From Swiss-Prot:
This is Co-chaperonin GroES. It comes from Buchnera aphidicola subsp. Pemphigus spyrothecae. Heptamer of 7 subunits arranged in a ring. Interacts with the chaperonin GroEL. CDD domains: cpn10 (cd00320). One of its GO terms (biological process) is chaperone cofactor-dependent protein refolding. Together with the chaperonin GroEL, plays an essential role in assisting protein folding. The GroEL-GroES system forms a nano-cage that allows encapsulation of the non-native substrate proteins and provides a physical environment optimized to promote and accelerate protein folding. GroES binds to the apical surface of the GroEL ring, thereby capping the opening of the GroEL channel. NCBIfam families: PRK00364.1-1, PRK00364.2-2. One of its GO terms (molecular function) is unfolded protein binding. Gene3D superfamilies: GroES chaperonin. Coiled coil: none annotated. Belongs to the GroES chaperonin family. SMART domains: Cpn10. Pfam families: Cpn10 (PF00166). One of its GO terms (cellular component) is cytoplasm.
Length: 97
């Protein structure tokens, strides 16, 4: 992938959702839903604070994150794969093992 996000933006590859219910029923279409988890594939340089300082992002490439797919989320196809471009503030949590 040849794309570099700017400022406090993050590029995420959405993780696949489990397509079976707890009872073993295969879910399809909208019933399966879309995952709000993904892997960070690229990060911007950081956010410029009011005093002009650059604050590095808290997430890094390879982090598994839970995100809010709000109005600011942009879905982009890159090399025939779907990625989300979000601001770091759209990320709700980092999943730690």
């Amino acid at each position: 992938m040849n794309i570099r996000p700017l400022h406090d933006r993050v590029i995420i590859k959405r993780q696949e959702v489990e397509s079976k219910s707890a009872g073993g029923i295969v879910l399809t279409g909208s019933a399966a839903g879309k995952s709000t988890r993904g892997i960070v594939t690229a990060v911007g340089n950081g956010r410029v604070l009011d005093n002009g300082e650059l604050k590095a992002l808290d997430v890094k490439i390879g982090d598994t994150v839970i995100f809010s797919e709000g109005y600011g989320a942009k879905i982009e196809k890159i090399d025939n794969e779907e990625f989300l471009i979000l601001t770091e503030s759209d990320i709700l949590a980092v999943v730690e093992d």
